[in-house]
């Protein structure tokens, strides 16, 4: 087992790790929030969350960056490997922009990926509270529900269909995952996601000793989860501060909830992961269909 935490852009992953081209089983990541946080400024002054405004020019630039990352992820993945993207919607000046749907559209337009499933991460205890405007102005046009969910978009590279692991709890096969977010100020990063999230995906779609990649490794939840599960991993970030943070977390105790560590077997013979090329048929659960 090996862990690499790399200072550099994942858009050049094949240059940083040419020996891993075509060897990654799973790419799992959460891109920087589109307009919520300036990560470079936060690395200098962590006491302040720097926010920027939504603009079409910036949106185009942001989507172009993501597309370059997904293209490089495709290069790094083995045939039949998976890409899992955790992303939230963009909220700016009262308007809601469907970033997850935009990413799915871009992935589809590339002609490279097989769409498997979108899982909805229900944050349970946290989110953007917007319902107050409805209480103040009880009219249909003022309906603004609280934002309590994010997307986990799952696509795969064409190739042999791999059976999921037999130690996957049945609740993970549902399209909604109830996971509490990381409590505020417990990790020195503006937007860490809970280790439970990559932990589930890594257990579902990889075997021990296989490779996992996170193009936006940030606080290191993905590389930490991979280590805990006996997988090799490579994570990228462009900020030295977050590289040091991710490395330091490798030795920390797991923060995965005890319930997630319990093994509740499912019959792997009843399922195969992902659709066949050109088809969108799926059976019960997460992007799976019966043989």
Tell where the protein language model's regions lie, with residue ranges.
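Alpha-helix boundary/capping detector
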Residues: 99, 133-134, 224, 252, ...
């Amino acid at each position: 087992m090996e862990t690499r935490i790399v200072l550099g852009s994942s858009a050049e992953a094949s240059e940083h790790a040419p020996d891993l081209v075509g060897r990654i089983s799973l790419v799992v990541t959460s891109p920087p929030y589109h307009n919520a946080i300036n990560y470079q400024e936060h690395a200098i002054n962590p006491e302040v969350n720097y926010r920027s405004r939504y603009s079409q020019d910036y949106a185009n630039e942001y989507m172009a960056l993501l597309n370059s990352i997904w293209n490089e992820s495709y290069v790094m993945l083995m045939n039949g490997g998976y890409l899992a993207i955790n992303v939230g919607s963009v909220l700016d000046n009262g308007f809601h922009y469907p970033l997850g749907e935009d990413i799915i559209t871009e992935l589809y337009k590339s002609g490279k990926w097989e769409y498997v499933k979108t899982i909805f991460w229900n944050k349970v205890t946290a989110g953007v509270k917007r319902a107050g405007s409805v209480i103040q102005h009880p009219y249909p046009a003022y309906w603004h529900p609280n934002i309590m969910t994010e997307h986990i978009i799952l696509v795969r590279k064409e190739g042999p269909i791999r059976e999921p692991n037999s130690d996957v709890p049945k609740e993970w096969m549902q399209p909604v995952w109830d996971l509490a977010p990381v409590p505020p100020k417990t990790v020195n990063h503006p937007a860490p996601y809970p280790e439970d999230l990559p932990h589930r995906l890594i257990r579902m779609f990889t075997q021990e000793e296989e490779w996992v990649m996170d193009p936006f490794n940030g606080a290191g939840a993905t590389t930490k989860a991979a280590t805990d599960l006996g997988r090799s991993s490579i994570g990228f970030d462009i900020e030295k501060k977050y590289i040091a943070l991710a490395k330091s977390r490798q030795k920390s105790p797991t923060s995965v909830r005890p319930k997630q560590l319990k093994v509740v077997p499912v019959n792997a013979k009843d399922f195969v992961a992902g659709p066949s090329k050109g088809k969108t048929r799926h059976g019960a659960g997460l992007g799976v269909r019966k043989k």
